[in-house]
Amino acid sequence: MSSTRLETLALCLQNVLADKLANVDQQLDQLIITVSPVNLLPVMSVLRDHPELGFEMLIDLCGVDYSIYGVEPTSEQGREGKRFAVVYHLLSIRHNRRVRVKAFPEDDEFPVVVSVIDIWPSANWFEREAFDLYGIVFTGHPDLRRILTDYGFIGNPFRKDFPLSGNVEMRYDPDQQRVVYQPVTIEPRQITPRVIREEHYGDSE
């Protein structure tokens, strides 16, 4: 969206949602609003139902693990040191615009947010995926179980503290004539330190 349209949408959101917004930001031609988990459900309902907003479609939902992210959190980002986020991408077909919504669960050890499945049924499998990969619990979800990993899988593979080699590996056992699980035999690998460059690195070259 153009900067003018983004500013118009930002002003509309601030007028309609007022103190329910923790933060409003623009990044890469995208409007991002941060919402407290306590206000998530009422905010999402307004985003869908208000005639000036009309975000009738949830096109994506994902989890984020910000631990060892490499960038210090600031109050302006609305994160303030919290580890996990749930990110929602909404589309208004009527007004031809998008908005990104972030909610940061309060408890890093047991991240919980309310399910938005009653507002957008498409959230069903999205929330199951975030639960499976990040361990984020969505209260009110009618069938919150793993969707990508095995039923007996241990841990959440998209968390930053999950080992790259996993916890177990599979092999065929000729004596038992079946596939069996065993502890991983891969040796730890040397990981190259992450390099975070400045935002406009290389622009002058």
Swiss-Prot record:
UniProt GO MF annotations: NADH dehydrogenase (ubiquinone) activity; NADH:ubiquinone reductase (non-electrogenic) activity; quinone binding
Catalytic activity: a quinone + NADH + 5 H(+)(in) = a quinol + NAD(+) + 4 H(+)(out)
Alphabetic keyword roster: Cell inner membrane, Cell membrane, Membrane, NAD, Quinone, Translocase, Transport, Ubiquinone
Pfam families, alphabetized: Complex1_30kDa
CC terms in the record's Gene Ontology section: plasma membrane
Name recorded for this polypeptide: NADH-quinone oxidoreductase subunit C
Subcellular location: Cell inner membrane
EC number: 7.1.1.-
Function: NDH-1 shuttles electrons from NADH, via FMN and iron-sulfur (Fe-S) centers, to quinones in the respiratory chain. The immediate electron acceptor for the enzyme in this species is believed to be ubiquinone. Couples the redox reaction to proton translocation (for every two electrons transferred, four hydrogen ions are translocated across the cytoplasmic membrane), and thus conserves the redox energy in a proton gradient.
PANTHER family: NADH DEHYDROGENASE [UBIQUINONE] IRON-SULFUR PROTEIN 3, MITOCHONDRIAL, NADH DEHYDROGENASE UBIQUINONE IRON-SULFUR PROTEIN 3
Organism of derivation: Nitrosospira multiformis (strain ATCC 25196 / NCIMB 11849 / C 71)
Family the entry assigns: Belongs to the complex I 30 kDa subunit family.
InterPro entries: NADH_DH_suC, NADH_quin_OxRdtase_su_C/D-like, NADH_UbQ_OxRdtase_30kDa_su, NADH_UbQ_OxRdtase_CS
Membrane disposition: Peripheral membrane protein
Assembly behavior: NDH-1 is composed of 14 different subunits. Subunits NuoB, C, D, E, F, and G constitute the peripheral sector of the complex.
Keyword Cell membrane appears in the UniProt entry: yes
Gene name as annotated: nuoC
